[in-house]
Amino acid sequence: MPGVQTLLPVMLNHVNNGKLKIEKLIKLICENPCDLFGIKNKGYIKENFDADLTIVDMNKEVIIKDDWIESKCGWTPFNNYKVKGFPISTIVNGEIVMENNKIISRAKGRPLNF
């Protein structure tokens, strides 16, 4: 599905442009979905919660390209779109799965609990 992989970079760009506060972004993409759907142990950095985190560099500038897209569709409506603010590392269940724009381990996800 186009747009999933580009959601965070595009929204971080809005934060850098003053259109969105980082606290609001965290609520929108982390906390609110888990609260809305009643997903347990996700969405917050808290003791006994799953260690699912994304580390971002708010100063990193990137031009989004179709060849960066990992989804099966292989394209993005944001092709050639320049963003400032980019994820540099993703941690799933405490394991680093993406670092410096390279997948280093496939996610070892677990079923969600509601």
Where are these regions (language model features)?
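His/Asp/Glu-enriched, well-ordered alpha-helical/loop segment
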Residues: M1-N59
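C-terminal cap of metal-dependent C-N hydrolases
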Residues: D50-K102, R106-P111
